[in-house]
């Protein structure tokens, strides 16, 4: 971006200066509306989410057999909710900032099959595509026991079709593993940030991995191009897919059920704050949409990004969405949080969700490493760096009197609050890689 343009952008949006300086930044969204007001802009409804629930239920008997690790949950891919009181104390001590309310961790990091939040959206979209093809071919009805998809004739049928996706790692992992299991030929276009072990794991499942020297945007573009030349190839578009988004959104009702089981209340007197790491935006966007449908105006969602990849904060704050990238303002998009190394946000997610998000913040790689170490020490839970992005959120909210005043939160409401940090990945990180992460924390 030329200097004159850059100066006028900074004049209009002074916060951009802090982003360019790679400062850890918090922006509370002044454009937040009620759910009723913001929902029409999403372009999806409660019914769409119910359809996704129903589809995942139809596939549950298949998943329980195809992936024995899901048998105990009856083929439902869901993660545990954990209280992390020792980590809460550690954060308060390290940052000299009390966190009022209770801190919980949503362990999508340990979801079965692919060990990340992408096991929600990625697997869902592959299943939705397989169902569509099988229904159209007359091989399946909605009333069937879907475990029949494991038979050789279905494998044979699906092998005529292929799936392609561009990814920094975790989405590729979930789509690759699922597609290969169903019988699709699958190609994952991996950006320069992708970890070697993720590529190796995909190849071990018979997935074709194409590697790029450039970032996520290039991998997606190349994947899209390659798929266009083959009518039997389906491209899963992380930047624009409504199907992926709906796969994530199912988490809202599921969390509501987990809360009900624990007797945890979410209402005006007991607000819920949720902190979601954000890359291109599909995962956190879909989850936040589902949470809003489940808890209405009593849930407050925040997106967390690396200081080197603040694409969604930049896009929503300036209103330019996918018309601006972090590279345009001189930021390099290089971060240890490989799952969040995205320079240009999803325009679909930004425009759909900008009224339903309470805020955005950035944190440095070092902060993620520090918290990664503390969580391992205090709670014995090991995550990858990206998954710690949400952990900085509770301090930011508890430290901002102006945010609390705008929303009219009393001290008592904050004492009764639940702070939920969405841990997005790390359950499958190899031991030696994890030890390298742990060594970087202070």
UniProtKB/Swiss-Prot annotation:
Its EC number is 4.3.1.18. One of its GO terms (molecular function) is pyridoxal phosphate binding. It catalyses: D-serine = pyruvate + NH4(+). It comes from the Bacteria. Belongs to the serine/threonine dehydratase family. DsdA subfamily. NCBIfam families: D_Ser_am_lyase, PRK02991.1. This is D-serine dehydratase. The gene is dsdA.
